[in-house]
Amino acid sequence: MPKHSKRYNEIRKLVDSEKAYTLDEAVELLKKTATAKFDETVEFHIKTNIDYRKSEQNIRSTISLPHGTGKSVRVLVFAKGEKAEEAKQAGADYVGAEELADKIANEGFVDFDVAIATPDMMKVIGKLGKVLGPRGLMPNPKTGTVTEDIAAAVSEFKKGKVEVRTDKTGNLHFPVGKASFEPDKLKENIKSAYEQILSLRPAGVKGHFIKKAVVATTMGPGIKLDLNVLAEGKR
C-alpha cells in the first residue's frame, strides 16, 4: 500500500469513509481538506451500473457546469476560411488545417485541452487518431466537437463545458470546479453535473444507474455523497 504523507493522514481523519454526506456537508469537508499550496481541483467520481462490456452502454458526452471548472481551457480548431475566422473571433487558441494536423502528427504537438473540427476537416485529421485518441482529444460528433457551429462550440468549452466518458470499468471521473470556489458555486456545479449524468442513462441499464458518487480535492480523501438526498433520491 502507498505510504501517505502526514498532511494527508491528518485531513483523512476529518472524513468518515463509512458515512454518506449531504451536499452541504461534503462541500464543507472539501474546503477543510483542501490544504495543498495550490488551488486544488474538485473532482467528481461516479460509479455506474452500466455493463461496460456492452459498447452501447458506454457513455461519451458533455455536460455544462453553471460556474465552469475554474481552469483556463486551451481550444484547438481544425477549420478553413470563414469557419477559421469564426474560431479566432470566438477565442480559439490554435486554428488551422493541414499544417496543424502535420504539426500534431510529426511533432507530437498536444498542448491543448479540447480539439474541435468542422465536418469537412475529418478527412484531414483522420490520421491523428493514434495521437489524439488515447488522450481523449479526437474530435467526435457525440461530444459536440465535430460541428459547423464553430463559434458556439469554442465559446461553450471556454466557459466550462466538460467531456465525460466512462472508463474501462464503467466509471466517470471529471472536474467540477476549484477548491477556492464559493461553497454555493461548488454545490450548484456538483448538483447540476449529477443531474446531467442521470439524463445520460443508457437504455439497457437495469436497476439503479448510479451506484456511488464521491467528491474529492486533488490531494484530499474521497467524500461519499448521500444519493438518497442529492437529487431527490434519483439514481
Curated annotation (Swiss-Prot):
Family as reported in the entry's similarity comment: Belongs to the universal ribosomal protein uL1 family.
SUPFAM superfamilies on file: Ribosomal protein L1 (SSF56808)
Keyword Membrane set for record: no
Keywords linked to the UniProt accession: Repressor, Ribonucleoprotein, Ribosomal protein, RNA-binding, rRNA-binding, Translation regulation, tRNA-binding
Gene (name only): rplA
GO biological process, one term: translation
CDD domains: Ribosomal_L1
Gene Ontology CC terms: large ribosomal subunit
Presence of keyword tRNA-binding: yes
Pfam family, one: Ribosomal_L1
Quaternary structure note: Part of the 50S ribosomal subunit.
Protein name: Large ribosomal subunit protein uL1
Protein task: Binds directly to 23S rRNA. The L1 stalk is quite mobile in the ribosome, and is involved in E site tRNA release.
GO molecular function, one term: tRNA binding
